[in-house]
Amino acid sequence: MDKKLYPRIGEEVIWETLDNGLPVCIVPKQGFSRKYALFATRYGGMDMRFRLNGQWLDTPAGIAHYLEHKLFENEDSDVFELYAATGADGNAMTGFEDTIYLFTCTENYAESLKILLDFVQDPYFTQENVDKEQGIIGQEIKMTMDLPNRKCFFNLLGALYAAHPVRNDIAGTVESIAQITPELLYRCYYAFYNLHNMALAVAGNLDVDEVIAICDEHLKPCEDMNLEVKFPEEPSLPVKPLVEEHFSVGVPIFSIGFKCAPYADDVIVKKEVEANILLSLLAGKMSPLYK
């Protein structure tokens, strides 16, 4: 168990890699009433082409988000009902690079953590429930098409990238999700929902040994997968310098993007901070442009 102290901010972070390969991050918060847990996998909206055990598979846009939705529906229960019984507030989110399942609570933390670990490891996909979800997510996609901020953001990505799947909406399109089948969901699940490709983070006034014991009891051992994700070749320059679209909004919305080569992991955080400072200076609430 690796403990790191941050005296300047009064924090302690505990790291432990379990025998099953899952890295666990624990942040003790003495005196806090609310507790948190996040169970995440490195699988997001742009991971559309991957190779597992030598076989390449191309998947439709939106399948990672679709899979996130379907995991909440088990064969004999609804996960939100299980959380309601413990008083926990559960949720999930799919990003470009990851999918995160989380809950917060003030009591019954151990029971809620068991629910989280169990349902994420228990996929249940049938043709009937997959077809039902297509209608639900299809309506969600149609609703987001009318959101100016979201539309502006993905117009920017479409102007920057010619082929990289980051240009696609994480939820996909009505047409792309119609291609999703139970078999395809299972293949994506067993490729990416592997404990060696996942992480657990917990925080709050909790018992560290109890958290580790629950993980050891409820996590299923698995072998590391020979998984490779591939992205298409991308030109260095943007596709278009400008994209305009008219919406009925009171205040114009704009986004600016800079296309650059990928940074190493240890540089990304620094570059993000630099970019946020620069953007605040250029277009923040105290900037001449905003005023």
Indicate where each model-derived feature is located.
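Acidic/histidine-enriched segments that form metal/cofactor-coordinating
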Residues: E75-C188, D209, L289-K291
